[in-house]
Amino acid sequence: MEDRVIAGMQSTVSRRDFIRTTAVVAAATAGGLAPGAAEGTDLLGAPGAAGRGTLIDTNVTLSRWPCRRLPLDETSALVARLRSQGVEQAWAGSFDGLLHKDIASVNARLAEECRKNGRGLLMPFGSVNPVLPNWEEELCRCHEEHKMPGIRLHPNYHGYKLDEPAFARLLDIARECGLIVQLVVTMEDERTQHPLMRAPHVNVMPLLALLASRSNIKIVLLNWSRGVSSALVEKLAAVGQIHFDIATLEGVGGVANLLKQVPADRVVLGSHAPFFYLESAVLNLK
């Protein structure tokens, strides 16, 4: 199976090569590996990963989804499932970051939970809400105190748009700190959202203008495929600073179709576990 060619791609890329590329891209984005470090090696996962088949999942979430219990919403159970699927490293946000106003406590709990579980598998990505007072201080705390490699943003739950000055300021600070910015376009299919928790897709169009004047900032779009048109995907891919996860891609040829629009070195594995089944994302690589 490792050498099976993903059908429909414009260039011949084996599953093994694609997994290597997405894993190395994730590691390089996190600053742990130079983009070309895997050339001539068998590295398939996180920096220092031994053996084949290891993966980096850039999209998992800890704690409780507000509307219902999810399978694997206990951190220890999620870690066990990640390991069983060959995941060597997982970038973790917190469901608490959606609605809690005490974001500092949310991030402190997230950092501690990642330290206590997984023996280094979990990398915390803190929540930052630029609508709240002192958000700049919390952003710096994620970087300086918690030593997080990045942050995860939920504009649709926090009530701001990407063309507002606060978001531009957030990008500038994140760039200065060398932080990855994960932008969640949607958390849940709009058809199944709780009536009192309607959250529209984030409009990511403003990224085109924002990134035109901001180089060296790392953006990862999560759960984006239902909220971003094909035409906009091509424009975003042309920017060169944006990476795309595969969590919400649908259909047998979802990954192959994406690779017709986006270079393989900017596509990363993301499962949206435990909200989605981890196995679904892994199967998308086959």
Regions flagged by a language model, labelled:
Residues S14-P35:
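N-terminal export leaders
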Residues L33-R68:
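C-terminal segment of N-terminal export signals and the immediately downstream linker at the start
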Residues I56-T58, W91-S94, F125-G126, R152, ...:
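Active-site neighborhood of phospho(di)ester-bond hydrolases with catalytic His/Asp-centered motifs
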Residues S63-W65, G97-H100, P130-N134, H158, ...:
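Active-site environment of divalent metal-dependent phosphoester hydrolases
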Residues E88-Q89, G97, K101-D189:
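Active-site gating/metal-coordination segments in enzymes
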Residues P149-G150, D163-V268:
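Catalytic pocket-lining loop regions of alpha/beta-barrel enzymes
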